[in-house]
Amino acid sequence: MAFVLRKTKMTDVRTIHRLLMDCASKKLLLPRSYTELYAHLRDFIVAEDAETANVVGCCALSITWEGLAEVRSLAVAEEAQGQGVGRRLVEACVSDALTFGIYKVFTLTYQVDFFRRLGFQEVSKDVLPQKVWADCIKCPQFPECDETAMMIEL
């Protein structure tokens, strides 16, 4: 499958939500509400099938603190998995971080092997206090988080 990456449009929100909820139902990531998606729309990029123009993946880069950003809400449609969509989305977010002068990018994930192949290494959640107090404290799984914290230093 050929695909292109692009910034999101308002019309992508429902598709992004559907992708995220599908992955959340499989316990691959945490769900995001429409409110969160609209509030953070500018953080997202999408992968679009070059032939059909359907959105087949999404990922967001969220700046969390000086010099630190998070790759979050990575989701790829089942029919597009295994074709490099997720890898390209994460690489684009990491590249975006560099344009902001951010040299540390982290993720909280259940997909440890995938992120390890992209150069991320496991870290203690203790090195991410801004994340814990900004987002994690609102999570229904807090304080019993079962996601793995991973980081790449650029």
Task: Give the role of each language-model region.
Residues 12, 67, 110-111:
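A generic "binding-loop/recognition-motif" signal
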Residues 82-95, 107:
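Conserved acetyl-CoA-binding loop-helix of GNAT-fold acetyltransferases
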Residues 54, 77-88, 100, 117:
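Conserved glycine-rich acetyl-CoA-binding loop
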Residues 19-51, 55:
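Active-site rim helix/loop that mediates acceptor-substrate recognition in acyltransferases
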Residues 46, 53-63, 67-75:
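Conserved beta-strand in the GNAT
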Residues 2-16:
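A short beta-loop-alpha structural element at the N-terminal edge
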Residues 128-154:
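C-terminal "cap" of GNAT-fold acetyltransferases
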